[in-house]
Structures are given as structure tokens and as C-alpha cells.
């Protein structure tokens, strides 16, 4: 919609689908009394479709933002902070689409929407940030359990990047903190989950093993790198240095 940065009409919900919406959406009023960011002349169908897109983007229901009393939704109430936050986010999206997107691309072809960042998460965070937070609270075992749980629930749905890059970056964070044992645990899980073949991933596995005092494993890692990529002179040098150790 033009006034807040989404294309008006692009989210229209077919009338036949309205009958199959959850009960809270079927309570939708015919007149709207408290529109502050969305166009005041918006149609019921368009507003319902827009709100539905918000709900899908955050994986929430109407009562996430709207007050519910005795199984009925008070759509006009501003009592919930989440509704106030949603307005701010809509204003932010509008500013991005109106004032910035057009400067770097064709504004008709690219538009930021809620789902652009949220991807079905109420609180969108990169997986690396989630793992760092869990490591600080629950240690490495809790972190590994969380990764496996999230992967089992969200793999292939777009909420998180479960690939080797995320775990490589998380391992680099652990190594910088001298958490060598934890780094090894993450990288071994990385190989078990993703079966990576990149030089970068093998390098980090080797460095983790080396810094954790597992020299034989580190040498095996570097041998694998040289086998896969004979031109990798750095890996060959590291292997030679480790082989000279007594």
C-alpha cells in the first residue's frame, strides 16, 4: 500500500477464503475506528488480507497485537505494546520502500515487507546470534540440543540458515574466546549435519582440533584439505608444521 510501503492490492484475499479463516479473523469489523498508519479508506477485504500477511510473516494470530476479551477481539484497543510496535515497524517499512529502495533499484520490482526479515519468526534473529545466546546461558550441550531442535522444526522453511556457514562463523566466535573444546563439538556436529566439503570448513575443523590439543586429528583434517584441493599451499604448510611436532 502506497502510504506505508506495500503495493496496494497485491495482498488481496479471495472472498471465498474469508469463510475459512479462524474465528478471530471472522470477527473482523465492517468499520475501522483506529487506523493510524494504514490508509483510512482501506477496504475490509484489503485490510483483512494485509493483517493476514502480517500474521503469516510472524507466525502469530490476531491476539498477538489485539486485545482479546471473552473470546472477542477488540481491534480498536491500543493496550498491547505489540500493536504499538507493529505501527512503528510499518512506518519503518514505509520509509525504507519510499525513501531508500528506489535509490538502489527499481522500486516497482522490490518492496520490503514484514516477511523480508521475519520469515515466520516473531523475534527474527540470525541462527548464529541464537546459538551465542544459548551458549552463554546453557553451555555447549544446551547449544547443540537447541540447534538440533530448531533444525528438526525449521529445516527447509527459511527461518534460519542451518548450513555450514552459520556453524563456521559460530566456531570462529568460540575460538576467539579460547573455547577450544566447544569449538570442536560444534564443528564435529557441523560435519555430521551438513557433510561439508569446503576448504574453509575443513580449515576451521583442523584449527579447532589443533587448538584443543588433538594434533593427529588436525593433521588428518589438513590431509583431507590437500587431498580435495592440492593447490592449497597454506593447508600443506600447516600439515608440515604439525608433522614436525614431537
Question: What does each model-identified segment do?
Answer:
Residues 24-176, 194-198, 211, 231, ...:
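Sequence context surrounding c-type heme c attachment/ligation sites in exported
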Residues 10-20:
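Bacterial N-terminal signal peptides
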Residues 190-191, 224-225:
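Canonical positions in the second alpha-helix
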Amino acid at each position: 500500500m502506497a502510504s506505508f510501503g506495500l503495493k496496494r492490492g497485491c495482498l488481496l484475499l479471495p472472498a471465498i477464503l474469508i469463510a475459512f479463516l479462524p474465528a478471530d479473523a471472522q470477527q473482523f469489523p465492517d468499520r475501522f475506528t483506529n487506523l493510524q498508519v494504514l490508509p483510512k479508506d482501506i477496504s475490509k477485504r484489503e485490510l483483512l488480507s494485509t493483517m493476514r500477511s502480517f500474521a503469516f510473516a510472524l507466525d502469530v494470530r490476531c491476539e498477538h497485537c489485539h486485545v482479546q476479551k471473552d473470546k472477542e477481539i477488540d481491534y480498536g484497543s491500543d493496550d498491547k505494546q505489540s500493536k504499538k510496535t507493529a505501527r512503528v515497524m510499518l512506518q519503518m517499512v514505509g520509509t525504507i520502500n519510499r525513501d531508500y529502495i528506489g535509490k538502489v533499484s527499481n522500486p516497482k520490482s522490490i518492496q520490503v515487507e514484514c516477511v523480508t526479515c521475519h520469515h515466520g519468526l516473531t523475534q527474527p534473529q540470525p541462527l548464529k546470534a541464537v546459538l551465542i545466546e544459548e551458549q552463554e546461558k546453557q553451555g555447549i550441550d544446551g547449544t547443540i540440543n537447541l540447534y538440533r531442535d530448531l533444525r528438526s522444526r525449521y529445516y527447509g522453511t527459511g527461518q534460519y540458515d542451518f548450513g555450514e556457514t552459520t556453524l563456521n562463523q559460530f566456531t570462529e566466535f568460540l575460538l576467539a574466546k579460547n573455547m577450544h573444546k566447544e569449538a570442536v563439538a560444534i564443528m564435529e556436529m557441523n560435519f555430521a549435519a551438513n557433510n561439508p566439503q569446503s576448504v574453509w570448513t575443513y580449515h576451521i575443523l583442523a584449527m579447532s582440533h589443533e587448538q584443543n590439543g588433538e594434533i593427529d586429528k588436525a593433521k588428518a583434517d589438513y590431509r583431507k584439505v590437500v587431498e580435495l584441493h592440492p593447490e592449497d599451499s597454506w593447508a600443506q604448510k600447516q600439515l608440515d608444521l604439525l608433522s614436525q611436532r614431537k
